[in-house]
A protein has these predicted regions:
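Residue-level signal for inorganic ion chemistry
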Residues: 31, 83, 165, 202
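Conserved SAM/SAH cofactor-binding pocket of Class I
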Residues: 55-138, 148-149
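Active-site capping/gating segments
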Residues: 90-93, 167-208
């Protein structure tokens, strides 16, 4: 598994040390253990977790912007935990309303010694941070119009919302409010995952 993690991450532009890879393997071990009792994820075997959780998360590593990152609807901590592990210079706030999932995230943060992660049990739409986040991550959170309405209070003029999607969401893009624009988009190829993946980068403001 360590070799799969290192080689898969390298294909995504992430240079994992052996220590990083061992910590990611430890994360998946903890997830598998907790999952037997708390049903945190539908992916139950470790080998599938490598692609569906860790490498899928690391696929957006190169698109992070700024130091303050929010992961909304983080679930069991993806994509936030793997990204925080390989980006210790960034500060990650992992947000979910589900108590058992945030308890797992908090456990993983302690177990892995992640000093740059703040787990937060809350409804995203109720948050009013003192400062906007630089990047807001969302993996399978909601259709784009609903996502943007929910995360708007977390965003400033330079915030980038990274929406991780499966198939290209043309109908959702057609329904975007005019106060948002697509700043960029990318097709993602995740090693070991034979499924469509794309990333939509959104910013507030109308393009000129």
């Amino acid at each position: 598994m360590l070799e799969r993690l290192v080689h898969g991450a390298a294909a995504l532009g992430v240079a994992l040390t052996e220590h990083d890879a061992a910590r990611l393997r430890q994360l998946l071990g903890e997830l598998a253990h907790w999952n037997r009792q708390f049903n945190l994820t539908g992916i139950t075997d470790l080998e599938s977790m490598v692609s569906h959780h860790v490498l899928d998360s690391l696929a957006v590593h190169r698109y992070l912007h700024g130091a303050a990152i929010a992961d909304v609807g983080t679930g069991a901590g993806f994509p936030g935990l793997p990204l925080a592990l390989v980006n210790p210079e960034h500060r990650f706030t992992l947000i979910d309303s589900n108590g058992k999932k945030i308890r797992f995230v908090s456990h993983a943060v302690r177990t892995l010694g992640l000093m740059n992660v703040d787990p937060l049990q809350a409804r995203v739409e109720a948050l009013r941070p003192e400062r906007p986040f630089d990047t807001v991550l969302a993996r399978a959170f909601a259709p784009l119009p609903e996502l943007l309405a929910t995360v708007a209070p977390l965003c400033g003029g330079q915030t980038r919302v990274l929406a991780m999607k499966g198939k290209w969401p043309q109908a959702e893009l057609d329904a975007l409010p005019r106060v948002w624009r697509v700043a960029d988009s990318h097709t993602l190829t995740v090693p070991g995952l034979a499924e469509d993946r794309c990333l939509i980068v959104l910013m507030s403001g109308v393009a000129h």
